[in-house]
Amino acid sequence: MTMNRPRILVVDDEPPLRELVMVTLGDAFVCDEAGDGDTALARLEEARYDLVMLDVMMPGTSGTDVLRHMREDDELRDVPVVVMSAWQSPQDVASALEAGADRFLAKPFRIDELGSMVRALVGRSG
């Protein structure tokens, strides 16, 4: 029996973090990656995603800019987004949520926390 696995886009400028997320989620999800905001925007035009894991601080187009673009786009506005950031003051969390993030995941994070959050969001949106 073959089932379509949900598709996730992992966006972070740190390759080891992208790899960790993709390995952690790879059994249950199809994972694509982008190392910057511009590549993320291109990937979002090429494929349909069930969830986006998005770093805030990246060179070039920031994660916040990608998130704002997604929320203004009719095709992307309902895709759940988990913002990942080492910045974790109450103001940083509020800023991410106000920009349209569904959840905020502080770096470094626990693997079990990541898995639970992603499964809950993908299950809710699917």
Specify the residue positions occupied by each region the protein language model found.
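Acidic, metal-coordinating helix/loop segments flanking the phosphotransfer/catalytic sites
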Residues: 33-51, 69
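C-terminal output helix
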Residues: 91, 109-118
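Short, conserved "switch-loop" micro-motifs in signal-transduction and mechanochemical regulators
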Residues: 87-88
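Receiver (REC) domain active-site loop signature in two-component systems and cognate sites
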Residues: 58
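Two-component/phosphorelay signaling modules centered on CheY-like receiver
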Residues: 15-32
